[in-house]
Design a protein with these regions (language model features):
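Residues in the short beta-alpha loop(s) of Rossmann-like NAD(P)-binding domains
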Residues: 37, 186, 254, 278
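Mid-domain Rossmann-like dinucleotide-binding core that forms the NAD(H)/NADP(H) cofactor-binding site
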Residues: 128-207, 211
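Local beta-strand N-terminus motif with an aromatic residue
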Residues: 154, 221-222, 297, 310
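Glycine-rich cofactor phosphate-binding loops and adjacent beta1-alpha1 units
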Residues: 149, 191, 196-271, 311
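C-terminal hydrophobic helical "lid"/dimerization subdomain
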Residues: 187, 236-240, 280-332
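Glycine-rich beta-strand-centered segment in the early N-terminal region that forms part
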Residues: 9-24, 39-87, 126-128
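Rossmann-fold dehydrogenase core element
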Residues: 247, 260-299
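NAD(P)H dinucleotide-binding glycine-rich loop of Rossmann-like/cofactor-binding domains
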Residues: 54, 81-160, 298
């Protein structure tokens, strides 16, 4: 990664908006592009050279012909550009379009001083601060996961992982009225999950955790389990924990393989649901979620780096220090 001058996009073209990025969150999926591991990214596109950054807070500089945003307005960017014609797009699930393009991956992203994006990708956030605005994108992934899992008020849910996505899932589930247990090995992250609405936080070996959750649910197991950690060993545990007729939502991505007993599916009639990215509707709901909980979310933003130290920020994030949660690059 280098700091370099690039061509100015000039005035907004038809259907597009020019924005001035303020803050960009670093995500685990960014590591693949940064390290050259593009095989883990979707689509046979030309990746390099590429300006990264898909968790973006920005100020509108030129709204072009867009009628939805105004000059000077702060916006979050929904980074997904679906094709619009495939089966998922035609059925309202553009988030899994096989030909999608992603800002910051297939197209240049927010780690630059001016960025041109389609008007359909910008969402006004009112007086939300830049860090929280950048967090709308990961929050939208949590919102989508819980939409897939059909979270219900009053029901018990277990969230595996208290990274940014897991914490956002804890927040969103609690905001929906669910009773949440969040599982993570790092005490500081468990503490933050508690502050974001978890009823219980825990970390224990497999059998001890199973016993603890069974006790919490009066022996039934939780109706909903959301896996955000990406650890291959968690899925078999989730299938064991979830109640009969329950739902398991898999958000965390892993290139490994997980061993489990297929008989658990007909025996318990479990719904196992994948969850990827977010729809535009999820993104709008995430704007509302983050806006309503901005004070609680402030502790998520653990480290800040200026744009001139972006490479250092990525290397720091990839070292996975235990005190780091969401690392933000300030752009302008």
């Amino acid at each position: 990664m280098v700091i370099a001058d690039v061509s100015d996009p000039g005035p907004a073209r038809a259907g597009n908006v020019i924005v001035r990025p303020e803050a960009v969150g670093i995500c685990g999926s960014d590591f693949h592009l940064f390290s050259g591991d593009v095989g883990a990214l979707s689509g046979a596109h030309h990746f390099y050279p590429r300006i990264q950054g898909h968790e973006v807070s920005a100020i509108v500089e030129d709204p072009g012909d867009a009628a939805t945003v105004n000059e000077g307005e702060r916006v979050a960017i929904w980074p997904l550009l679906p094709c619009g014609g495939c089966y998922p797009c035609r059925t309202g699930r553009a988030n899994v379009c096989p030909r999608f393009r992603l800002v910051g991956v297939h197209l240049d992203g927010g780690l630059q001083q001016r960025l041109e994006v389609p008007a359909s990708t910008v969402f006004g956030v009112g007086d939300l601060d830049p860090d929280s605005t950048a967090f709308v994108e990961p929050a939208s992934i949590a919102v989508h996961a819980l939409t897939r899992g059909n979270v219900k008020p009053g029901e018990q849910a277990v969230v595996f992982g208290a990274g940014p996505i897991g914490l956002a899932t804890t927040l969103a589930a609690a905001a929906a009225g669910a009773r949440v247990t969040t599982v993570d090995p790092i005490p500081a992250r468990r503490d933050l999950a508690k502050r974001l609405g978890a009823e219980r936080v825990t970390w224990a070996p497999t059998q001890a955790l199973t016993d603890e959750v069974r006790d919490w649910t009066n022996g039934e197991g939780p109706p909903l389990v959301v896996e955000t950690s990406g650890e291959t060993g968690v899925l078999p545990q989730a299938l064991d924990l979830v109640s009969a007729a329950g739902r398991v939502v898999v958000v965390g991505m892993s290139s490994g393989t997980a061993g489990f007993r297929p008989g658990v599916f007909p025996e318990k009639e479990i719904d196992v649901l994948g969850s990827s990215c977010a729809t535009a509707e999820d993104f709008l709901n995430a704007v509302h979620l983050v806006s309503a909980n901005r004070a609680s979310l402030a502790a998520i933003f653990s480290h800040h780096f200026p744009l001139t130290r972006a490479a250092e920020a990525f290397e720091f994030a990839m070292s996975r220090p235990p005190d780091a949660i969401k690392i933000v690059v300030t752009v302008n």
